[in-house]
């Protein structure tokens, strides 16, 4: 028996037309390197929510290699700004390189450090 959550998940996934090739490559590499990134159903949900809500500002805590920030950057409005925080020193240069390569509009700002400290310094909007 298909539950309500399964139907909703199936509906949201049916709206997803896939990712841009560079995101597919990043996802493949992340899986190979065992870097945690968001799953396919979460990717579809994020795209759906971005299309519905059209946020102007997004805060992400924990970007790993930058996959989800880049996904949100490409599937959000042109004037959307994304602030992402990462503390794992090994992943920060990889995320920064990915943002330099794939964020030509500079929608994404990477803050380095512990989110509990950085969040105290941020102002709304």
For each feature predicted by the language model, list its residue ranges.
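A short alpha-helical cap/connector motif
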Residues: 1-125
